[in-house]
Amino acid sequence: YRVVDIQSRVAHVATRIPFRYGIAEMTQAPHMVLELTLKRGTESARGWASEDLPPKWFTKDPDSEFRDDVVDMVDVIAHATAVAPTLAAPTAFDLWWQLHESQKRWARANGVPGLLAGLGTALVERALIDAACRLDGLSFDEAIMSGTLGFESQRVHPELEHQSLDEAFSGRGGNELSIRHTVGLSDPLTDDEVVDDPADGLPVSLDAVIARYGVDHFKIKTKGDLSADISRIRRILELASAHKIEPWFTIDGNESMTS
């Protein structure tokens, strides 16, 4: 497996409504699209991946300029895309592993935070997986379970050495996905709290979103203020109860963590 061509493009996108997370609120951001060609012998296929480049997502420095944050994100992507075509491996996973290790060494040598460096690796990884699946006309789960990708979980997490994929995932495949709705820190819960209404006929408040779409899976952003966070979660549970849905949710407060 070799990456014989890799290109990236940037589009400027705007959010429908402001999205607040941690110390930042996003209304617009660059959107990176990456395209690569993966070659195996005489065969080749193209793969794609894309990612927003949001301020303060990978680094939590309140004093840095947004322009500098974007440059830092572009730099880690540029390094990963420069390294990828220099590698060759017997499997797609081995190719990713080489890139992963190279990116880590570069990050340590240049004082780049690991989470930020991982952005570059992950973007190439997703395009690589897409291309590898297209080479054999397989879905992602088929490529994983058949061994086509060469995935070795124990190389990432040694404690999984004696855990086979068949044992872990056999019979767990599905043909449905639940839509998970993210509740941002400043997202209005009810219509009377709506401030930034785009007037496009689509719901804005969480109450209106549940009423329109019937969503019952949520990711709730928290800010580290225990009293305020608990109060907000209670209100969300009350909304779910009013709509007679059984809510499933995760709590996301990583932006408020210091270590």
Per-range role (PLM):
Residues 44-142, 146-147:
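Metal- or metallocofactor-binding catalytic centers and their adjacent structured scaffolds
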Residues 18-21, 31, 126-128, 161-167:
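Short alpha-helical segments and helix-capping/turn motifs at coil-helix boundaries
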Residues 21, 50-58, 181-185:
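Glycine-rich phosphate/pyrophosphate-binding beta-alpha loops
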Residues 138-162:
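Electropositive nucleic-acid engagement tracts
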Residues 34, 42, 124-126, 137, ...:
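Conserved, mostly hydrophobic/aromatic
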Residues 158-259:
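Metal-dependent enolase-superfamily TIM-barrel catalytic cores that perform enediolate-based chemistry
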Residues 38-43, 173:
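Short acidic-glycine loop/turn motifs at beta-strand connectors
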Residues 1-35, 39:
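Short, Gly/Pro- and small/polar-rich lid/capping loops
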